[in-house]
Amino acid sequence: MLHFKRCQLLKQIAQKCLSRIHVKTDKHPQLFLSRTFALAELRKSWHSIYSLVGDKNIILMGPPGAGKTTVGRIIGQKLGCCVIDVDDDILEKTWNMSVSEKLQDVGNEQFLEEEGKAVLNFSASGSVISLTGSNPMHDASMWHLKKNGIIVYLDVPLLDIVSRLKLMKTDRIVGQNSGTSMKDLLKFRRQYYKKWYDTRVFCESGASPEEVANKVLSAVKRYQDVASETFISTRHIWPKDCEQKIPAKFFSEAVIEGLASDGGLFVPEKEFPKLNCGEWKSLVGATYIERAQILLEKCIHPADIPAAKLGEMIETAYGENFTCSKIAPVRHLSGNQFILELFHGPTGSFKDLSLQLMPHLFAHCIPPSCNFMILVATSGDTGSAVLNGFSRLNKNDKQRIAVATFFPEDGVSDFQKAQIIGSQNENGWAVGVKSDFDFCQTSIKRIFQDSDFTGFLAVEYGTVLSSANSINWGRLLPQVVYHASAYLDLVSQGFISFGSPVDVCIPTGNFGNILAAVYAKTMGVPIRKFICASNQNHVLTDFIKTGHYDIRERKLARTFSPAIVILKSSNLERHLHLMANKDGQLMRRLFNQLEEEHHFQIEKILVEKLQQDFVADWCSEGECLAAIHSTYNTSGYILDPHTAIAKVVADRMQDKTCPVIVSSTAHYSKFAPAIMQALKIREINQTSSSQVYLLSSYNALPPLHEALLERTKQQEKMEHQVCVADVNVLKNYVEKLAQNQFIGKFSE
């Protein structure tokens, strides 16, 4: 078996040292290489590669023209290690002919087999290896390489690759037949690269080999440093030097636990990753799935979820479950206003964008020996989205993960209630509560913090509690993608050039959606202002204007927009923590005061900081209906009540000096009675599906949500449990569900 011994490394070090000789006289040159200097150089070069990857190889993978050979040489020089080019050092020496001659001689299929055999007979350690473009198409050889290497995918823009191949005068590569364009073949090959890589280097157009090499080293360092990306509670108090540091959590732990043990919410201990301008530009022509893969890979450490596995989850979540191939398209409404359509998922709301993915993240992260009960409070759309998302898990995962959804029995639309009830399945149930959303949300938090009850569930039923509300980081993170994608769509459609600012206007209740836009900005999306739109329950609007969060005298009013009828905005804590430079002590004081006294006031400096980025206003019920009516008359587009509220506030607050992206958070068919009232259609006592069919006859935009309507036909006949507003009663339901779902399996 061919093995590149470490003597190759010593040879390179010796050559490097000899380049630093001293000449004593011109007539009699003598070499002086002190023992101390030689050992120092040896230790320095040896340490650089082995401190980074140990005995493992750094394996560069990518299409022809990605720059693997050049980048590999640069990395080898930086680390002082052996560099192996599979084409030059393995294949041609094994075959005694050039690679192109071999391909011409044996053809595509036989070439792949013989290339694979040559790699299987090769071994190395502590080296930089540049693969051929076709190596990833041979499974056995890739498994062989992967055993002792970190595979780095050089993801170079397709147009750059095609241009380089033309300059290299490469007119044929493995797998290319007559009639197949180079561009199509390169697209086809991506599936193989995605299958094998451990970490990706996303190369912006025109990046130099030196820049790519530095990115590779950073990516490998991140991959090796499994403790580099941890999470803390928003109420975490930083210890003094003499005190013991409280262990931080990994991504997988934050997703599993949902809520921190001190009552706070999990946030990254370090700053959000950033993309540079070139990287963002390279995403302009990408699909939603491709954008999601790039962005989420940067936010989730591969030790928590391997990159290839994450890619599979993303493709499963967004591949066929959405009625629009663009997943979250942006539509020009009028003037400088654009609608971000977030309702093309299976349950017709923006919650699908995260809850089609989050269950797969959760199932991957949990240990195989435990059962998990997901507790969810919903103000309307979350319930059906959670039940739908977790119902799509595979059979084994559904046997160990169950969902209990609690919703205000009289606080959601008839359509939403029918949808929640109808989404019940073998591992998911819905319970109506005779109270409001805030009671449901607060009760779930209290259940999580009741150590006696959670301990009892663990002992008796082998069951651990978790959450799928936006308090769970795994639920919030995917929402960052669609805000970034919306901006990129405006660039790709030619409405703006990259770098031009935009405003976003978002109907806001629990602050999760708008917070995701804040995180998108921290990653590099040039969002200028965040416009917070409220209905007549305008707690957040008042807070943004005054810095005083006050719910002492407030009573929730029923509105046409139930999804934002919320008193305690959970994700606000995350944003205040970010603004206050991660002051956990302050978060404890503020939110304990809110719990005990039902209000808090932030300092003037924080109010000013908040108002630098945020503006807010609210909309009455009459203004909401009028906006639906006028928008339909002028554009033929029907807004749902939440989106109508955002449009009213955007009209009022945005200065029209840049585009504003209005988040459309639900399909209008979910609120048919309100739409019929707004459009002055004589309301008839009909079923929800009949009302939707009536609205569809108007041939308005957006089109009828067929998948939503189909599910509704089956939902109106189902039953559900209803309970009083008592946290102990909710506990009883949780125990009963755990018993029914898990007791047989746990006792086996």
How should each PLM-predicted stretch be described?
Residues 77-116:
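Conserved substrate/cofactor phosphate-moiety recognition/catalytic segment
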Residues 459-493, 500-501, 578-657, 721-723:
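Active-site-adjacent helical/loop segments in soluble small-molecule enzymes
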Residues 24, 28-53, 74, 78, ...:
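NTP-dependent small-molecule kinase module
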Residues 110-148, 643:
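Glycine-rich phosphate-binding loop used to anchor ATP phosphates in small-molecule kinases
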Residues 391, 525-542, 648-716:
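Catalytic phosphate/nucleotide-handling subdomain of diverse soluble enzymes
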Residues 68:
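Conserved lysine of the Walker
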Residues 147-191, 686-697:
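A glycine- and Lys/Arg-enriched "phosphate-lid" helix/loop adjacent to the NTP-binding pocket
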Residues 167, 385-444, 491-498, 503-594, ...:
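Glycine-rich phosphate/pyrophosphate-binding loop at beta-loop-alpha junctions
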